[in-house]
Design a protein with these regions (language model features):
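Conserved phosphate/metal-binding and DNA-contacting active-site motifs used
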Residues: 1-135, 140-230
Length: 230
């Protein structure tokens, strides 16, 4: 199993196809309409964080909330923006409120890519996956996962491990495509929602063991030969 967890890069994986409808830039309002009308997901409008364009994942960002060290820059809904997207401004961000239709498992990009390859090779139905420009992958899973996560990790033997793995649940938000996070770039779909998984995201237990292992390996890894996904 270890040989499946060498270094991967985002460009080495098959990205979600654009399709004929996706060849023009999708606006925030168009995306929000799809999320609510087609998939039945709640959305909210957020004030985007600002930063220096093209400055990379380590660039400082300024959150409209005013907190100097905001833990979630740009991920606060504007007043009255809950449950719908008021996206008249081109720079408005679209947010998913988690804990409703789904929760979100959040892992480092490298670990997430490795786990995704492994899961799909095993035939696991992964569900929608977001790629954030902050260097994170976010896996949409069944609602209620955040509440059960400590017990799930305990049952799988990962409760004592220092894993860079979190879960966004009730009361939290994640940025939805095509939201641009200040100075970093847009959020993208690595695996798009489909009719099969949008209304019924996978149970976290189906993904969690592989994700936890990949996160653990990411902390231990020394120089290893790169393995490129075919």
């Amino acid at each position: 199993m270890d040989n499946l967890f060498g270094e991967l890069r985002l460009g080495s994986l098959r990205l979600a196809p654009l399709g004929a409808r996706r060849r023009t830039k999708v606006t925030a309002s168009q995306a929000a309409a799809e999320y609510t009308g087609r998939w039945g997901w709640a959305v909210a409008t957020g004030d985007p964080a600002t930063g220096t364009p093209g400055s990379g994942a380590t660039a400082p960002t300024r959150c409209p909330c005013g907190a100097a060290r905001c833990a979630a820059p740009g991920l606060h809904p504007v007043p009255g923006g809950e449950g719908r997207a008021r996206t008249g401004r081109a720079e408005a961000s679209v947010l998913f409120p988690t804990g409703r239709a789904f929760d979100v498992l959040d892992v480092p990009e490298q670990a997430g890519l490795q786990a995704l390859v492994r899961l799909e090779r095993m035939g696991t139905q992964v569900g929608p996956v977001l790629s954030a420009p902050t260097g994170r992958l976010q896996f949409l899973v069944a609602a209620g996962t955040a509440r059960r996560l400590p017990d799930l990790l305990y049952r799988m033997g990962w409760d004592d491990a220092a894993l860079d793995l979190t879960c966004h649940g009730e009361g939290s938000y994640v940025a939805a495509p095509p939201t641009v996070l200040g100075g970093l770039g847009p959020v993208r779909w690595l695996r798009r929602p489909t009719r099969d998984n949008a209304g019924c995201p996978p149970e976290a237990r189906l993904l969690l063991g592989t994700l936890a292992y990949a996160c653990h390996r990411g902390r231990e890894r020394t120089a290893e030969p790169a393995w490129i996904a075919s």
